[in-house]
């Protein structure tokens, strides 16, 4: 595996006489650009130049001599301004590409890291918006990838089921039941008209609180159904009301007061966040005694840490930039490492149809909800395309492209390779052709070699997703793997009854491609069809 090769290269470099006594940076293996003709490229010499105080090209020249002695390295070369390019032995490629392991071998209990990723967390005051789909795709994919790499990771949806908005929702629903317009500051969506029609008879004697409870529960169930249809299953749906049942906001406030971090002014209780780069201090308890949402958020995050999570990832919508400095200040006040709080802000989604933007307004009635978009193009296309951009990039979601069943559509392109590989396996089985157990002594064609090298980089792509908190590395990898498979399939006849040995080896290669694509799609929450 590449992890072992990396360690072997580091061991050789760190013990080399030419670098003796120097503090050297770790080695980072990356795929070599096609024009180099190599398999692996290192920028190590340029990183080492800072500590060695030498020209990167001189360092690269010295490093190449050392790396050339590493087992399974066929050759190494250098290029300006200090790149190191490595060609691997075919035997290493053939054996390593068959290794299915993703998790590092750790002794039991060694990895104490526990990650909690909170995402979507939309208010239960209306249907889920399209942007929630982007957050869901991002969050759920990361949870799956973390766990695949052996890092314990849970997912959570925070439900704002109490407070003023819940009361306003109840008032708005009651107005609809009575054939009236909701108050100006209430909720005016057509979904409340449909809800009112369902309960008009049964709700004649209801109080406003009962209307509120019914509406909140109805919409929470709607959100849960939408997430399930989107192939997202949260570890826990955490309700804000749970915080108040346990008096956690009050306890969090006492904690801050004891540390001298909360103060009273103008009849309210404040948290001094300006000293931590916030633009103003924040109110925790209003002058009328009502706690703010910020106090509830502090209590909620304290609860996360108290449950044993070591890293808290909050995936937030584009309008939450102001939330980050105050929450970082709160984490610091709770006595936790600021680095343990990882906010990710994803940008908006613009829907494109017929080459034009779809107006995202309630009046247009077009694709306002995630449910409508999912039903129109399918959860697979939504999830893959949402995951294909970095969170900080604005996204144009092309509805026409998402519906295409051609290679222009990246999710179809990748899924089709899985279906083709499955079809090849079925054909071989019908012809009673056996798959090889390994690729020992099998001479690789250039297309086979390229394909196997791409299989090697699967775990590397997953690690990059974790490093950058973005699954786009995986979608890019799968698209490239699919392209390599097409080149292999066009150049190499797989099922050839006259050459059973070659067929056996190529069936094994196809099977490994199928496995990698299936796993990769699974980590993105996308299906891997056996037939298309």
From Swiss-Prot:
GO terms for cellular component: cytoplasm. One of its GO terms (molecular function) is ATP binding. GO terms for biological process: arginyl-tRNA aminoacylation. Pfam families: Arg_tRNA_synt_N, DALR_1, tRNA-synt_1d. Monomer. SMART domains: Arg_tRNA_synt_N (SM01016), DALR_1 (SM00836). Keywords: Aminoacyl-tRNA synthetase, ATP-binding, Cytoplasm, Ligase, Nucleotide-binding, Protein biosynthesis. Its EC number is 6.1.1.19. It is an enzyme of class 6 (ligase). It catalyses: tRNA(Arg) + L-arginine + ATP = L-arginyl-tRNA(Arg) + AMP + diphosphate. This is Arginine--tRNA ligase. Gene3D superfamilies: Arginyl tRNA synthetase N-terminal domain, HUPs, Isoleucyl-tRNA Synthetase, Domain 1.
